[in-house]
C-alpha cells in the first residue's frame, strides 16, 4: 500500500519508520530539507521538499486512488487543506488528519463532503486514555464503568 505522510517531524518520522518496517511504500513531504535528508539516509522512502498543502508537492509523490494520505504537520490548517486537496484533486483512497485545536471538533462534514476520512487529536486521545486508566485504578471491578 502507498502512504503519503505530510510532515517529517517527530510524528511523521516515527510513522515513516514504522510503515517502512512493515513493508509499506512511503513518500513524505516537508519543507525541512534536513529532516528529509535524515530520513532518506535511514529509510528507503521518497522524500519531497515542499509545502504539504501545495498540489505540486502532492503531485510529485504520485498520489492516486491507491494512496492513503496522513497529514501530521504541526499546523492544523495545513493538515486540513492538504487532506482536502489530496482527496478532491488526486482522488486518494483515504485521508487521515491530525488536529490539535479542539475548536475544529469531530464533525468531519465541516471540512467538505468526504474530504477527511479520519480525524485524530493526540490531546483527546491522551485525555481519554488517562481518564480510562484512572477509572480502572479506582474501580474495583474493571467491568464497572460507572466512574467513566
Regions found by a protein language model. Name each.
Residues 12-13:
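N-terminal Rossmann-fold NAD(P) dinucleotide-binding loop
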Residues 8-9:
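Glycine-rich Rossmann-fold phosphate-binding loop(s) that bind the pyrophosphate
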Residues 2-5:
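Beta1/beta-strand and adjacent pyrophosphate-binding region of the FAD-binding site
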Residues 36-136:
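Phosphate-bearing ligand-interacting subdomains
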Residues 19:
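Aromatic pocket-lining residues of Rossmann-like dinucleotide-binding sites
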Residues 138-148:
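Single conserved hydrophobic/aromatic residue that forms the stacking wall/gate
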Residues 30:
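Conserved acidic E/D residue at the C-terminus of a beta-strand in Rossmann-like folds
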Residues 27:
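Conserved beta-strand positions in the Rossmann-like core of class I SAM-dependent methyltransferases
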Amino acid at each position: 500500500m502507498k502512504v503519503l505522510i505530510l510532515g517529517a517531524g517527530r510524528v511523521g518520522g516515527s510513522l515513516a519508520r514504522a510503515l517502512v518496517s512493515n513493508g509499506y511504500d512511503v513518500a513524505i513531504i516537508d519543507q525541512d530539507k534536513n529532516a528529509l535528508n535524515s530520513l532518506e539516509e535511514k529509510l528507503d522512502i521518497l522524500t519531497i521538499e515542499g509545502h504539504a498543502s501545495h498540489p505540486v508537492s502532492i503531485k510529485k509523490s504520485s498520489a492516486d486512488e491507491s494512496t492513503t494520505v496522513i497529514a501530521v504537520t504541526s499546523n492544523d490548517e495545513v493538515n486540513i487543506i492538504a487532506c482536502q486537496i489530496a482527496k478532491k484533486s488526486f482522488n486518494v483512497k483515504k485521508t487521515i488528519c491530525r488536529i490539535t485545536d479542539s475548536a475544529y471538533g469531530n464533525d468531519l462534514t465541516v471540512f467538505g463532503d468526504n474530504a477527511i476520512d479520519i480525524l485524530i487529536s493526540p490531546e483527546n486521545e491522551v485525555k481519554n486514555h488517562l481518564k480510562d486508566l484512572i477509572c480502572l485504578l479506582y474501580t474495583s471491578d474493571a467491568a464497572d464503568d460507572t466512574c467513566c
